[in-house]
């Protein structure tokens, strides 16, 4: 009997130990499951917070930074500026003027270099239309924009009432950009870049680009700052685009590239505001004082037939007679080519003050600048455009226009 009792006690003890072991094993295998769930919870993204931003024409707009999945850009320059900062894969539509595969669209800039189109045209070609676009398009096409289903619109229509009305009609934020009279060197351009960076959660990219432009401008200015006025040649810039039209009389007294590079403008003191035409008589009047002529590439197609018809006006210009005519790349092509405006400034500085810029190679500089703006080296593509005529160069006036 005692032996039987001892056996039963031992068996009971073994069963208790086995049960404890089973519970411990269960606890051990369950623990990793709990930890894995916690990791998934902490890894889940937090919801972005709404903020109110002030756009470049003073409108307060509520946005949710970093949340946007479908972007539409409308108006001259909007898609270009977005391309500098934003993710083009988020675009939900483009204006017809920027989709070069369409037959029925504005084509006045097809031969002219537009670096953002050269960089991302293959993306633009796949997108639906958000409107016609082009210099003559002065009103946003709300129905076409809605058909692209954007959750935000980037605009360059600088009219507060129209932008407010469009935002109300679309039901999504409409953010207005602008560049300002000094173009790429203007605080408004920097502000537009910063605004895009804030909205699309790319603030570092925007700041890097703004810092790059400021550094480039400072470098150009520092190299030319100590040149005496008496040693500066008088320079005339012509062919600047304005609403898609231009010729040898279209110029600017306050051409910002001249200001940055400390270049003497032959029209200084005439009171011309912005880009605009001078009279033919004024062109003849300044002819003897013009040491160097800078011609914008976009104007050649218009200047060539004028010269062939009557070369006498051109021949009154000293720079023309002496072969001191130089070709810059297109400053404007559906608004300002901001990266080209910066490269043009290097070209002008090197042309007018060659000793100070002997180390600057324009092809390398073009690639450096387009890489900073668009992430791609585009010199070859820019210079290959029909209206670029092979790139920056000195023009042989005896043969170039014949």
Each predicted region: which residue ranges?
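Structured C-terminal subdomain patch of bacterial secreted/periplasmic proteins
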Residues: 133, 184-200, 207, 211, ...
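A short, structured surface patch at a secondary-structure boundary
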Residues: 79-144, 152, 157, 266
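Bacterial Sec-exported substrate-binding components of ABC uptake systems
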Residues: 20-81, 204-237, 356-402
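Proline-aspartate-enriched helix->loop->beta-strand connector
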Residues: 68, 129-137, 141-158, 279-298
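Extracytoplasmic ligand-binding site segments that recognize negatively charged/polar headgroups
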Residues: 99-107, 136, 159-165, 177-195, ...
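C-terminal motif of bacterial Sec signal peptides marking the signal peptidase cleavage site
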Residues: 15-19
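Positively charged n-region of N-terminal signal peptides that target proteins for export
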Residues: 1-9
């Amino acid at each position: 009997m005692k032996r039987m009792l001892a056996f039963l006690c031992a068996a009971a003890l073994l069963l208790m130990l086995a049960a404890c072991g089973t519970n411990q094993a269960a606890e051990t295998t369950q623990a990793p499951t709990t930890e894995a769930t916690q990791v998934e919870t902490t890894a889940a993204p937090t919801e972005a917070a709404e903020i109110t931003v002030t756009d470049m024409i003073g409108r307060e707009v509520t946005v949710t930074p970093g949340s946007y999945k479908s972007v539409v850009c409308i108006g001259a320059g909007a898609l270009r500026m977005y391309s500098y900062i934003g993710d083009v894969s988020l675009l939900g539509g483009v204006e017809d003027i920027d989709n070069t595969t369409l037959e029925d669209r504005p084509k006045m800039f097809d031969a002219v270099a537009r670096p953002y189109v050269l960089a991302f045209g293959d993306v633009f070609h796949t997108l639906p239309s958000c409107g016609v676009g082009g210099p003559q398009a002065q009103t946003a096409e709300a129905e076409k924009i809605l058909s692209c289903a954007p959750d935000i619109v980037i605009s360059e229509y600088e009219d507060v009432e129209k932008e407010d009305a469009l935002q109300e009609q679309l039901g999504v934020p409409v953010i207005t950009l602008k560049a300002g009279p000094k173009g790429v060197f203007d605080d408004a351009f920097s502000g537009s870049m910063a605004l895009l960076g804030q909205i699309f959660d790319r603030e570092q990219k925007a700041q890097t680009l703004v810092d790059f432009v400021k550094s480039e401008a400072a470098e150009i200015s520092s190299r030319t700052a100590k040149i005496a006025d008496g040693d500066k040649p008088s320079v005339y810039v012509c062919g600047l685009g304005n609403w898609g039209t231009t010729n040898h009389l279209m110029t600017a007294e306050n051409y910002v590239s001249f200001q940055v590079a400390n270049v003497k403008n032959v029209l200084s003191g005439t009171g011309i505001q912005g880009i605009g035409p001078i009279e033919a008589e004024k062109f003849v009047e300044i002819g003897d004082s013009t040491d160097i002529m800078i011609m914008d590439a976009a104007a050649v197609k218009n200047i060539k037939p004028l010269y062939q018809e009557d070369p006498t006006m051109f021949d009154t210009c000293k720079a023309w007679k002496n072969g001191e005519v130089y070709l810059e790349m297109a400053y404007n092509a559906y608004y300002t080519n901001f990266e080209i405006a910066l490269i043009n400034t290097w070209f002008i500085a090197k042309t007018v003050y060659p000793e100070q810029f002997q180390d600057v190679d324009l092809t390398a500089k073009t690639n450096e600048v387009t890489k900073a703006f668009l992430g791609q080296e585009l010199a070859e593509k820019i210079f290959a455009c029909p209206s670029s005529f092979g790139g920056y160069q000195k023009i042989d006036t005896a043969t170039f226009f014949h």
